C-alpha cells in the first residue's frame, strides 16, 4: 500500500484552489493602509452584554430588527452572518449542486464569488463586463444554462461604478424562474439612492448582500447581511451555522444600527465623500496618473504610467495601495482607499515625486 500524504487526502478542488488574496494576507509594513477599503479611524463601543457563559441567538433579534428598519425591509427578509462573505457562500450552498450547477459573475469584480464556488466544488462561469464596465447582457444570456446564482457587485469593487438599473431589471427578467440574482451592495451607503432593496417585492429571486465593514467602520467585527424574500431566507437558515454571531459582535452591531449609530455612519459617509472628491481632483493633476475613474464608493481606481514601479515605490514609503493589474481590463490600475486628509496628502506628495 502506497503512503498517502495529508495533501493527497484533501479534495482535488481544494488542492488546486488559489485562496483569495485579502489585503491582510498580502501584508506589508506600511503606516498608511489604503488597500482594504476600511474606514481610516476606529469607532469606540462599550459592551453591554456580559452573558458570555450562554450561547448567543442564531439571529439576534435586536440586530435583525434594527437592520430591517434601517434597510426598509421586513425582519423576515433579513439574515445576519459573519460578514457578507459568509452570505456569498450560503447562497451557493443553498442553491447549487456541486458537479451539476454553476454560478456566474462579471469580472473585473470581487474575487470571493469564484473562491467560494471553487471551495464548494461548483462551476464558475465568467462574462467580462463591457468596456464601460457595465453588464454584457447578451453574453450573460448565452451562458445562463445551468447557472443557479448570478453575482453582480454594485457599486462594483474594484471599479467603483454603479451598474445600470435597467440592466439589472433585464437580468432579473432573464433569470426569473431560473436563478438567484445577488446584488452585492457592500458599498451602498456611499450611494444609497441606488439600492435595490425596494425591488424585493417585485423579484422573488433577488438577494442583496450588505456589510458593516465599510461605512459603518466595523471591518474587524465581521458582520454582514443578506436581504431577500422570506422563502430565500428560510433556505439560507437551513445551511447557516447555529451561532454565526458571537454575543459581543451582536451587541456592537445592534449599537451601530441604533438611530444614533445611523446618524454617525452618515456623518462618516459625508466626510469620506468630501475627501474622495478632493483626492480625485488632486490625482488628475499628477503627471504619473493617466486616468482617474469616477467612484460611488470609498475608494478610487486610477490608471498609472509604470504602475508596478509606482506601487512598489509607495509600498517602500509605507503607503500600501491595492494592485489591480491582474484583473481583466485593469492593466496599469491601482485602487486607493479614501483615508484621512493626512493620508491623502501622503499619497499625493509621494505620487508627485514619482519620475515619469
UniProtKB/Swiss-Prot annotation:
Homodimer. CDD domains: AAT_like. It holds the Pfam family Aminotran_1_2. GO terms for molecular function: histidinol-phosphate transaminase activity; pyridoxal phosphate binding. The keyword Amino-acid biosynthesis applies. Disulfide bonds: none annotated. Its cofactor is pyridoxal 5'-phosphate. GO terms for biological process: L-histidine biosynthetic process. Signal peptide: none annotated. It comes from Shigella boydii serotype 4 (strain Sb227). InterPro entries: Aminotrans_II_pyridoxalP_BS (IPR001917), Aminotransferase_I/II_large (IPR004839), HisP_aminotrans (IPR005861), PyrdxlP-dep_Trfase (IPR015424), PyrdxlP-dep_Trfase_major (IPR015421), PyrdxlP-dep_Trfase_small (IPR015422). Its EC number is 2.6.1.9. It catalyses: L-histidinol phosphate + 2-oxoglutarate = 3-(imidazol-4-yl)-2-oxopropyl phosphate + L-glutamate. This is Histidinol-phosphate aminotransferase. Keywords: Amino-acid biosynthesis, Aminotransferase, Histidine biosynthesis, Pyridoxal phosphate, Transferase. Pathway: Amino-acid biosynthesis; L-histidine biosynthesis; L-histidine from 5-phospho-alpha-D-ribose 1-diphosphate: step 7/9. The gene is hisC. The modification N6-(pyridoxal phosphate)lysine is found at residue 214.
